[in-house]
């Protein structure tokens, strides 16, 4: 595949994975309270489950309980109570394991619509409803003994980028779980000519890290129709803290995608390979009707001088990392993947949309977990962000972002010519 084809595919991915939103009027979000307590939206025990949601502009908040992750009506609706700093909470005193739930927020006398919440960590098929699970049941055998492969210096890293489906989908790969997380757990696979495939191929290459294209729950693939041809790179985020269901053997069972993702990480670690996630916090697949906008309208996105959604991502919106709770969301999310899934590094898509302070705060938080967890990203944006240039995590501000790597597009352009101009050579 040549570079021109890659650019075309990228444009198709953006077109199918991102949608624009409608006009929105700015409001003084600096007056919103900042919640500093434990940010967990679902805490399960066999005796009770506590639900929490940060929704500071809400008049009322309800949690709706369902028997299934898709279809049917809620069998129970529970009113939540305001707690502190914009948080709403309720405790349901019964064993809810295996049930599903959504939140609905009332603002200006209008119910905004169901969401799985801001911080959902387990969901049903297509990620429309969050799930009540027992987290101990998501750990594969040996998970507590899993260790990161050693890394002395970031300069020793050799990174191989892969897309879950593309890497293992070929019918001659000898892989049983083609196109799935589990493909990277299978050893001894090869083509009919004896060429190594899957994880054995990665080992023979001698790479130290694999960079996984978006592996969180994204919008563009219908998980109920996996027998149909569907494809996207995954740059259309829906639920940031949940593995993508189309790469699991059963997207209907919430525990399966979590367990299988962990199995993949553990297998790569045993092979001496660290795991980097491609993370896309700079935009969401949809704005109006999405989880952020239905929960705290306007807060998580920037607007332009006309009050319309800003669009430095080229995908219809750009998130407002400089706002305290969006900043905290990003920090909590990255650290969650590092702790719960033992992720070893993060590649930030369009990092130049984010502010310097937030990126440094993420680096500081990861250092407390393990300073060998790497961070790097694209030090640019697809358009002009609605934040002063001096505050942005752009490539020219690399000196203000210690221990955060950046891609160098000058090296690319010197080899193949300027991006977007195939008529001009290097």
What role is predicted for each listed range?
Residues 165-341, 358-370, 374, 420:
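Substrate-binding/active-site clefts of carbohydrate-active enzymes
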Residues 2-9:
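Sec-dependent signal peptide recognition
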Residues 16-17:
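C-terminal motif of bacterial Sec signal peptides marking the signal peptidase cleavage site
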Residues 99-151, 220-236, 242, 289-308, ...:
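Core domains of carbohydrate- and sulfate-ester-processing enzymes
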Residues 54-61, 96:
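Short proline/glycine-enriched turn/loop motifs at strand-loop junctions of beta-rich domains
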Residues 47-51:
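Structural beta-strand segments of beta-rich domains
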Residues 22-46, 82-188:
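The feature marks proteins involved in alpha-glucan
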Residues 72-82, 87, 228, 234-235, ...:
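Active-site-proximal helices and loops of the catalytic beta/alpha 8
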């Amino acid at each position: 595949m040549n570079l021109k084809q890659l650019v075309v595919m990228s444009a198709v991915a953006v077109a199918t994975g991102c949608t624009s939103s409608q006009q929105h009027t700015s409001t003084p979000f600096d007056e919103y309270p900042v919640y500093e307590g434990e940010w967990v939206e679902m805490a399960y025990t066999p005796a009770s489950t506590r639900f929490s949601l940060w929704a500071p502009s809400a008049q009322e908040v309800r949690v709706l309980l369902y028997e299934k992750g898709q279809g049917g009506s809620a069998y129970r609706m529970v009113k939540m109570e305001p707690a502190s700093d914009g948080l709403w909470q309720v405790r349901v005193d019964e064993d809810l394991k295996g049930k599903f739930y959504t939140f609905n927020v009332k603002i200006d006398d209008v119910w905004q619509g169901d969401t799985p919440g801001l911080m959902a960590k387990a969901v049903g098929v297509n990620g429309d409803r969050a799930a009540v699970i027992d987290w101990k049941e998501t750990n594969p055998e040996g998970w507590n003994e899993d260790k990161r492969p050693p890394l002395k210096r970031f300069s020793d890293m050799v990174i191989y980028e892969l897309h879950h489906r593309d890497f293992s989908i070929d019918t001659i790969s000898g892989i049983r779980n083609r196109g799935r997380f589990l493909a990277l757990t299978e050893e001894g696979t090869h083509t009919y000519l004896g060429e190594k495939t899957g994880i054995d191929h990665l080992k023979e290459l001698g790479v130290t890290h694999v960079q996984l294209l978006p592996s969180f729950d994204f919008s563009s693939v219908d998980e109920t129709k996996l027998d149909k041809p569907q494809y996207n790179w995954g740059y259309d985020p829906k639920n940031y803290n949940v593995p993508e269901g189309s790469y699991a053997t059963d997207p209907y069972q919430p525990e399966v995608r979590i367990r299988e993702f962990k199995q993949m990480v553990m297998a790569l670690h045993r092979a001496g390979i660290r795991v980097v996630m491609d993370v896309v916090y700079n935009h969401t697949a949809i704005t109006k009707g999405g989880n952020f906008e239905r929960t705290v309208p306007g807060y998580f996105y920037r607007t332009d001088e006309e009050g319309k959604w800003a669009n430095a991502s080229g995908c219809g919106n750009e998130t407002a990392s400089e706002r305290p709770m969006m900043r905290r969301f990003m920090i909590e999310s990255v650290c969650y993947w590092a702790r719960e899934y033992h992720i070893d590094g993060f590649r930030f898509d369009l990092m130049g949309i984010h502010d310097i302070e937030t990126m440094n705060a993420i680096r500081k938080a990861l250092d407390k977990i393990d300073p060998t967890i790497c961070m790097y990203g694209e030090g640019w944006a697809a358009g002009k962000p609605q934040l002063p240039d001096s505050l942005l995590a752009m490539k020219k501000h690399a000196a203000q972002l210690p221990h955060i790597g950046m891609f160098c597009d000058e090296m690319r352009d010197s080899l193949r010519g300027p991006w977007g101009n195939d008529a001009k050579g290097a």
